Curated annotation (Swiss-Prot):
Keywords: Hydrolase
Domain Glutamine amidotransferase type-1, chain residue ranges per copy: 5-221
The protein's enzyme class: hydrolase
Source organism superkingdom: Bacteria
PROSITE patterns for this protein: GATASE_TYPE_1 (PS51273)
Reported phenotype of the disruption mutant: Cells lacking this gene are unable to transform isopropylamine to L-alaninol.
Entry GO CC: cytosol
SUPFAM superfamilies reported for this sequence: Class I glutamine amidotransferase-like
EC numbers: 3.4.-.-
N-terminal signal peptide: none
Record protein name field: Gamma-glutamyl-L-1-hydroxyisopropylamide hydrolase
Pfam families associated with the record: GATase
Gene name as annotated: ipuF
């Protein structure tokens, strides 16, 4: 029985991975590894750290069935060595013919590697879109796109970013957006197809609370929250947010503008990437079929 081989690329530096481990319990790459293996035990994962100096200990990128790029605390427009290494890696990934997926930083990295542009948020009242992206709407192209299969046409979702896509590369199509930002794209570049989202469909309320605590000081500095206590109060409220949970009246302030009754917690885009892009590509590329049991 065949197993998919997925390369998970953590977008964070070593220091930031340690910070996430302190506040969330693990680095983002480990979160994605757990998500994939919980979805289907037939998935084999490898984790790489393309921001780190030194050679990557991976197979040739074309040998993988999928390449998944996590979020990051980094800013792609800063000419840091780790950023430049990741751009070079993403360019090689596009040349490999392997399906790609990116979340938040992962989408921004793919946009830049394919020739687009990412800059700090230009939205006056939204320097950092967190803890939620509200009013996300599928575009006409996105409404029929398999990445968003089973997603309602309008939705709210966990989010955490202070940068935005300001220019798309050639071969890119927007599949979702809200009033402030491009929220999802497909990019066909080189030999690979990339699907990606600006928001964080992989997170639980508990995870998002950890993200808030990890970035508490920067959230106060950029004006997203008034004090560290405000960040902590928000984190406590969001940590309890899950399907069917009732929001207490005192915590409603942290969910302003969010439709908590229809909030979608499933990581749909990631699972759809596996089912609708990775698996069909692997069957064509490697000539196998019939062994994969889809859930």
């Amino acid at each position: 029985m065949e197993k998919l081989r997925i390369l998970i690329c953590d977008g964070n530096t070593e220091a930031d991975r340690a910070s996430f481990k302190k506040f969330v319990g693990c680095a983002p790459s480990k979160q994605f590894e757990s998500l994939l293996k919980n979805y289907n035990s037939q998935i084999r994962t490898e984790i790489a750290f393309p921001a780190d100096p030194g050679p990557l200990m991976t197979l040739p990128l074309g040998a993988y069935d999928g390449i998944l790029i996590t979020g990051s605390n980094s800013h792609i427009y800063e000419a840091q060595p780790g950023n430049l290494r990741q751009i070079e890696f993403a360019q090689k990934a596009f040349a490999s013919g392997t399906p790609m997926f990116g979340v938040c930083w992962g989408m921004q990295l793919a946009v830049v590697a394919a020739g687009g542009e990412v800059l700090p948020s230009r939205v006056a009242d939204c320097s950092c879109e967190t803890p939620f992206a509200t009013g996300v709407e599928l575009t006409s192209y996105g409404s029929g796109h398999p990445m968003h299969h089973s997603r309602t046409s309008g939705f709210d979702v966990f989010s955490f970013h202070s940068d935005e896509v300001t220019r798309l590369p050639g071969g890119a199509v927007v599949t979702a957006r809200n009033r402030n930002f491009i929220q999802a794209v497909e990019i066909k570049h080189g030999r690979s197809t990339f699907w990606g989202v600006q928001y964080h469909p992989e997170l639980s309320g508990w995870d998002q609370a950890g993200f808030l605590r990890e970035s508490a000081r920067s959230l106060v500095e950029d004006g997203s929250y008034e004090t560290l206590n405000h960040v902590e109060h928000a984190a406590q409220a969001i940590s309890m947010f899950k399907a069917g949970a009732q929001i207490s009246e005192e915590n409603l302030v942290h969910f302003e503008g969010v439709d908590t009754n229809s909030f979608e917690f499933r990581p749909l885009e990631i699972l759809n990437w596996l089912d609708h892009l990775v698996i069909p590509t692997a069957k064509r590329k490697f000539g196998w079929g019939g062994g994969w049991l889809q859930k």
